[in-house]
Regions:
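Structural preference for beta-rich elements and adjacent junctions enriched in aromatics
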Residues: 37-243
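Mid-to-C-terminal alpha-helical segments outside catalytic/metal-binding sites
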Residues: 1-37
Length: 243
């Protein structure tokens, strides 16, 4: 066998796309997770509010950019089997978030509490949004969670404390699509609950998006925090209010 000398490389000819992604992107992402730039997503403005159906069937969702939740919060490891997408819309009154992700088996509280909030909802399968609107106080932000059962929870965070008594008035609708093993949810959050200053086109808020999936031991993050907690506001990405 001829020894390898000088510069050399591995050609990617014939390798399937998922292998190429792992070699060239996922491994690099994991290695660089502590120094990656903050991601950005632009919310699309809608002229009229949409009805919450839970299944993202309103036409407005089709035009919204997509945030991808592919990576583990702690170390940036890829979890493609439960990769989740999030779309963002806004109107004069509300911020809308639409989540979609696959599942193998749902882990939820039974019976579901649909008329009151459950502290510890995050200990089962949920999707989450953490939203910071005050650049002068990054330790203050709000947290929103929705479970596949339709249970929901909102919290006002002032690190290191949190208020479960706070009520934002946010609404959510959820659909579990058993036939294709996915679940979807739509959140509608009053802008007035997020900031006293109404956003305009170009406004930038801090945002991170998460998903817990116990069956796959996955805690996914849009912007991985590179530690064991989602409550790391310096690692939040940016929500930009677009036209």
């Amino acid at each position: 066998m001829t020894p390898i000398q000088g510069e050399w490389k591995i050609d990617a000819i014939g390798l399937p796309p998922q292998v190429l992604r792992k070699i060239y992107f996922d491994n690099a992402h994991r290695l660089l997770v502590r120094s990656l730039p903050a991601p950005e997503i632009k919310a699309v403005r809608i002229g009229r509010d949409i009805k919450l159906t839970g299944d993202l069937r309103a036409a407005a969702w089709d035009n919204a950019p997509v945030a991808h939740l592919d990576y583990a919060l702690r170390d940036g490891a890829v979890h493609q089997s439960v990769a989740t997408t999030v779309r963002v819309l806004w109107s004069d009154k509300y911020l809308y978030l639409g989540y979609e992700g696959p599942f193998s088996r749902l882990n939820v509280f039974r019976p579901a509490w649909l008329d009151k909030e459950r502290a510890g909802l995050w200990d089962r399968d949920v999707v989450e949004a953490f939203i910071g609107t005050d650049p002068g106080n990054p330790l203050h932000y709000t947290e929103f969670e929705v479970a596949p059962t339709g249970e929901k929870l909102d919290l006002d965070i002032h690190l290191p404390g949190k208020s479960l008594e706070w009520q934002s008035g946010f609404q959510a609708a959820t659909v579990v699509h058993q036939g294709r093993s996915t679940w979807t949810t739509e959140m509608r959050i009053p802008l007035s609950a997020l900031s006293k200053d109404k956003p305009v086109v170009g406004t930038r808020w801090r945002l991170n998006l998460y998903r817990h999936d116990l069956d796959h031991h996955a805690f996914l993050a849009w912007s991985p925090t590179a530690n064991d907690t989602a409550h790391t506001p310096e690692k939040f990405g940016y929500l930009i209010f677009g036209p």
